[in-house]
Amino acid sequence: MGRNFQSETRIAGFITKRDVILGGLRTGAIFGSLFGSFLSLLTGVGVLFIPFVGPIVAAGPISALLLGAASGAIAGSAGAGLVSVLTTLGMPEEKAAIYQTRLQAGEFLLLTEVPSDRAGEFQLLLESAGAEELSTIDKTLARPCPGPCKSPEDLSPEVRSHLSSEAQSTFIERYNGVLNETTDEFTAEQAAWEAVHQKFDEDENGVWSKAKVGV
């Protein structure tokens, strides 16, 4: 999340974990699913998730991650909503408030997923690079399938609930194909979301169900 990532925010509802993960995955900008569904939280503003030792959040004001809550969780842009996003991910509110304040002041925020047994190593690496206000959240991040997806029932509930039956089939077909080629779940998930994005648009409920014309 980059500098000047701020503006006025109007609270329009409440955030749940189900609301917090999946939206940016649809653009191919986010890889991996935090808690299984980092779905759009904020309107008109987003952050970029890129791969680097698991998903890393590293972005400026890019409309990718937080594009309009499917259930109207928060409307607006990062501003006041950022604390809600981070606390929903499990971060203490006081720490989230510090991050929001410093981000609004023009600094940067980096969120990365690393193996739990190497968390100390990565913390030292970030500190040596000048990182401040480090915080660790001990969470296991959900994945769309436990290995190959044999049927829609194998998809995590958060992913499945945001895909129509046709989109589920597209996701599974592409996911399994890339997984067989690479044995890399991370790459397979990215490719699967890209395939869905190419063939479908979201409906008003945040479900990828509207087939694109000519696809």
From Swiss-Prot:
PANTHER family: MEMBRANE PROTEIN (PTHR36109:SF2), MEMBRANE PROTEIN-RELATED (PTHR36109). It comes from the Bacteria. InterPro entries: ChaB, ChaB_sf, Low_temp-induced_all0457. The lineage of its organism: Bacteria, Bacillati, Cyanobacteriota, Cyanophyceae, Nostocales. It comes from Nostoc sp. (strain PCC 7120 / SAG 25.82 / UTEX 2576). This is Uncharacterized low temperature-induced protein all0457.
